[in-house]
Amino acid sequence: NRTYKVKAETGQSYTTPLVVMKEGKEVIITFGSDHLTAHTAEDGKLLWDCGGYNPGDKAMWRVIASPSISKDIVVVPYGRKGYFAAVKAEGEGDITKTNRLWTKDVGADVPSPIAHGDKAYLITDRGHIYCFDLESGDQIWDQKLPRSSASYYSSPIISGQRMVLAREDGVVMVMKLLEGGFELLSENKMNERLIASPIPIDNRLYLRGQKHLFCLGG
C-alpha cells in the first residue's frame, strides 16, 4: 500500500531518485525537471527545494539523466545537453539562491553523471567525458572516447580508479582514471545493443542487452 502521496511537478521526468542518510534518517532527493527537491522517506515532507532548471520556463521540459551525490553535493544535468550544475544538499525551504555552487554550459541528455570523491564526471551522448572539481566546478580535464556512429545511452560506473561505460552498439569500455584524463584499457564487444546501465554486484558486472543478460567477472 502507498504510505503517502507527494504532488508531482511534471510528467516529463524520467530520472531516478537518490536515497541518502541525514541525521540517521532516510532522505529522498528527486529531480523533477524544473526543481531538485528533498523529502523525508518516512512521510514525504518537503525539506528543501532548489529551482532554476528550466531557464526558459518551457511547458515541455523533459529530463532523463539522473542526479548524483558525493560529500553532500548533488550534480544535476539539465536542459537537453545544455547545462550541468552542482547544489549543496542541505538547509530548509527554497535553497535556490543560497546553495547552488556552480553551473557549466555543457550537459548530457541521457547518460547520468557521477559525483565520486571530490570530482564530478559528465559523459555526453557522443562519448565526450568531462571531469570537474566537485566543490568549485573548475574543469580538470576533458577527453573523447574513440569515434563511433553509436551513441551512449547507459550511465557509467566507477570502481576504484576504473570507469566502465557501455555504448549503444554493444561495446563495453573500461578506462583508468588519471589526474589529467583517462587511459582506455579495453573495448569489449558484446555483439548486442546495450542501453541499460551496467550494475556491479559482488565483484561481478551485470549488463542487460537487447536479448540477453550478461554476467562478467570471476
Residues of each region from the PLM?
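Blade-level signature of beta-propeller repeat domains, shared across WD40, Kelch, NHL, RCC1
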Residues: D169-V171, E192-G218
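Beta-rich carbohydrate-recognition and catalytic domains
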Residues: A38-D43, L47, Y78, F84-A85, ...
